[in-house]
Amino acid sequence: MKNTSKFQNVVIVTIVGWLVLFVFLPNLMIIGTSFLTRDDASFVKMVFTLDNYARLLDPLYFEVLLHSLNMALIATLSCLVLGYPFAWFLAKLPEKIRPLLLFLLIVPFWTNSLIRIYGLKIFLSTKGYLNEFLLWLGVIDTPIRIMFTPSAVIIGLVYILLPFMVMPLYSSIEKLDKPLLEAARDLGASKMQTFIRIIIPLTMPGIVAGCLLVMLPAMGLFYVSDLMGGAKNLLIGNVIKVQFLNIRDWPFGAATSITLTIVMGLMLLIYWRASRLLNKKVSDISD
C-alpha cells in the first residue's frame, strides 16, 4: 500500500510539474508580455501599457476576428453535414469492418497536415488534377479558379478537421439504445420523426463535442489560409504569426493570442454548460 501511495504521489507531482512548466509558465509569460511595450532593439520594453489590447478594437483587427469566427463556423457546419452521415454509416457497419475504416480514418494523421494542404493545393489549382479531369470530361471549357478564395480556405479546413468531427459522432451513434429506436417505430413514429426527436437529442453530446473540436483549431490554422486563401483571406492566427515573425511586435502578438484564448475559453464554458444540460436531457429521454 505504501509503495502504491508513493507511486501515485510521484505521478501526480510529475503531471503537475509538467503542466506548470509547459502550460502555466508559458501562458503567464504571454500574459505578461501582452502588457509591455514594443522595442525595436530587444523586442520588448519593460513599460506597462494597455495599448496592445486597445489596438484590437481597431476595425481592421476586429474585422479579421469576425472573419475568423465566420470561417470557423462555416467549416464546422460543413464538417457536421459531411461527418454525421459518414459516422452513422460507420456505426451501422458489421463489427468486423469497423476497425478497418476507423484505421483508414486515422491514417491521414500519420502525415503532417501542412504536407496534406500542399497536396490539396496542387489538386485544386488551375492546372491541377481536378480541373484537368473536368476539362477532359467536357464539363467545363476553362479551368475553375478555386484557389485563393474563401471557399478554398473552407475546403482546406474541412479537409484537415473532418476526422475530429467524425470521431465523437461515431462514439455517440454507436451508443444509441436500439430498443428505444425500435419502440419509437412500434409506436408509429416515422424515420424522420425518430431521427429528429430521438436520435439527434441522444447524439447531441457528440455533435457539440465535434463542433468544439473543429471550431477551436479552425480559428488558428494560419497555414491553411496562407496556402489556400492568400493575403485576402486572413484568419486571426495569421495576425498572430505576422506580429511575432515578421513585424516583431511581440506585445501585440501576445495580446492577440490572449484574446483568442479568452474567446476559446468562453466556447469551452458554453460547451461545459451545454453538455450538462444535454446529458440531463439524454437521461430523461432514456428513462
UniProtKB/Swiss-Prot annotation:
The chain crosses the membrane at residues 11-31, 71-91, 100-120, 146-166, 198-218, 252-272. It is a multi-pass membrane protein. It is found in: Cell inner membrane. Keywords: Cell inner membrane, Cell membrane, Membrane, Transmembrane, Transmembrane helix, Transport. Its main location: membrane. SUPFAM superfamilies: MetI-like. Residues 1-10, 92-99, 167-197, 273-287 are cytoplasmic. Residues 32-70, 121-145, 219-251 are periplasmic. One of its GO terms (cellular component) is plasma membrane. Required for the activity of the bacterial periplasmic transport system of putrescine and spermidine. Belongs to the binding-protein-dependent transport system permease family. CysTW subfamily. This is Spermidine/putrescine transport system permease protein PotB. It comes from Salmonella typhimurium (strain LT2 / SGSC1412 / ATCC 700720). The lineage of its organism: Bacteria, Pseudomonadati, Pseudomonadota, Gammaproteobacteria, Enterobacterales.
